[in-house]
Amino acid sequence: MFSILGNSSKKKRNTQIYRIFFTLTFSLSNLFLAICYLFLNVRTVSSDSSVSLYDRQLFDQSSSVILNPDTSDPSIVLSSLETMRDLAHDIKFGQDVLEQPLCDQLFVLMDGKDYPNTIRSMSSVVLASALSNNFIAQKKALEMNIMPKIVNTLRQENHPVTLLKKLFLLSKSVQSFPLSEAFISKDLGSAILLQLYDFWSRNSHIDIPSAFQEKLLSRLSIIFENIARSLENVNFSKASKVIPIEWVFSTWCSIFQKYLMNNWHLRSISTLEVLLNTVSTIQSVSESCPEVNFYEWLNDKNLAYKNKLIYQDPDLATEFNLIIKEALSLPWPKKYNI
């Protein structure tokens, strides 16, 4: 009997020890979490809870270098631009990029022929990051009349890689309908892009790889797809009375349609996908795509398999057949005799 009582009291002591152990473990765990929480939030700026003190210091330091590029090594200027590019994805910092004199200085770097192309290209990407999906930054850009500056910097560019980065900036700008309208309204923007496309797609550019020409067309395609998407929440018939959008869409959609029909079996999958999606988006918004034989070409049941890369990959074939099917379901003009 004493043995039984002794075992019972021992079990109680063990139970108490386990409880104390787990209580201490749980408390230490909570203490660790609390310390981590304080560590992560100690950097918060009291005046602006949306950004941290550390990030604000990074932004200000980068801005100081960018505003005085000639006093720093080019590698430091490039590093500062890369830092600002990353920070500009934040809504607050994106707005700050559009403040003066920083915004104007980015255009100075973009067009400065004495600066390395890496710096010129990254300056474009910083502005693109600031404008991407940032309504307030886009509104500020419109108030600053930024579009003529973007068009002008495109007109001056003669370096292939830097040109692509500047087109990337334009593609982010025209996500907003007011900026799309500013780009198209005087037909200045579209005319510049036609000149660029004509110049860089000539056969005389034997030193320019075909891969660049594909990237150029893809970037142009994305620009007009974004313009079309910016019209989705706008009355298209009213918009077309204000800006020459029908002519612009018709001109560029014809270029994209002809390229698809003439180069389907030759070009990369990504290029074909981008162009086909752009044609579909323009057609769904405006019904402005003019090539009469495009629907017949698109309606070929074996179309996807006429590209070797698609033919060799069943998953790609399935994906492209879905894209083609979606394109065929659009409201094509009556002249297609559907």
From Swiss-Prot:
Topology in the lipid bilayer: Single-pass membrane protein
Gene3D superfamilies according to UniProt: Leucine-rich Repeat Variant
Localisation per UniProt entry: Membrane
Alphabetically ordered keywords of this record: Membrane, Transmembrane, Transmembrane helix
Recorded superkingdom: Eukaryota
One Gene Ontology cellular component annotation held by this UniProt entry: membrane
Keyword Repeat: no
GO molecular function annotation: adenyl-nucleotide exchange factor activity
Main location: membrane
InterPro entries to which the protein is assigned, alphabetical: ARM-like, ARM-type_fold, Hsp70_NEF-Inhibitors
A GO biological process held by the record: SRP-dependent cotranslational protein targeting to membrane, translocation
Membrane-spanning parts: 20-40
Protein name per UniProt: Uncharacterized protein C1071.03c
